[in-house]
């Protein structure tokens, strides 16, 4: 190769390396907050659940309420990563991009609308559908009939009450 060929070869390599670094930085920037939020939720789970059974876990509601008064319930879907507190703020989208402590979080929290109760005939539980199966991302597993047959229960826990949906 001549001088011009060497120049374009080195320029191409430099551009490719720079593009790869930008790609990796963007991937990290997108994934880190999600993974951080998930780690915080796992820490919360280990701090408030003292006994782990599906039908009747012992959840330390006093500890949860000290963390955030807006935590009103807990949802668990065995066989999935769905095992989260449910929050209810005064504005319907308060927890769309806030974690259970009220701090900004790209992934947000699982929440219901203000004024909604678990006694309503219809209740929408909101949460993000994350590609890495966090939050409600693992609901896609239920597209498989075999998976659904093996994991056909949803548990909603409230202080003194367990709702088992089948």
Predicted segments with their positions:
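N-terminal Sec-pathway targeting helices
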Residues: 1-17
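Solvent-exposed, non-transmembrane regions of membrane-associated and secreted proteins
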Residues: 17-166
């Amino acid at each position: 190769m001549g001088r011009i060929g060497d120049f374009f070869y080195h320029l191409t390599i430099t551009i490719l390396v720079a593009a790869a670094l930008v790609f990796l930085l963007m991937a990290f920037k997108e994934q880190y907050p999600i993974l951080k939020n998930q780690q915080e939720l796992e820490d919360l789970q280990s701090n408030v659940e003292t006994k782990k059974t599906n039908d009747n876990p012992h959840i330390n509601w006093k500890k949860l309420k000290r963390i955030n008064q807006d935590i009103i319930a807990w949802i668990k879907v065995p066989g999935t990563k769905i095992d989260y507190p449910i929050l209810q703020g005064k504005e319907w989208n308060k927890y769309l991009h806030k974690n259970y402590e009220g701090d900004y979080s790209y992934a947000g929290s699982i929440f219901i609308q203000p004024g909604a109760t678990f006694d309503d005939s219809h209740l929408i539980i909101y949460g993000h559908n994350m590609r890495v199966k966090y939050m409600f991302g693992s609901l896609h597993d239920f597209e498989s009939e075999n998976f659904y047959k093996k994991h056909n229960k949803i548990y909603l826990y409230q202080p003194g009450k367990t709702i088992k949906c089948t």
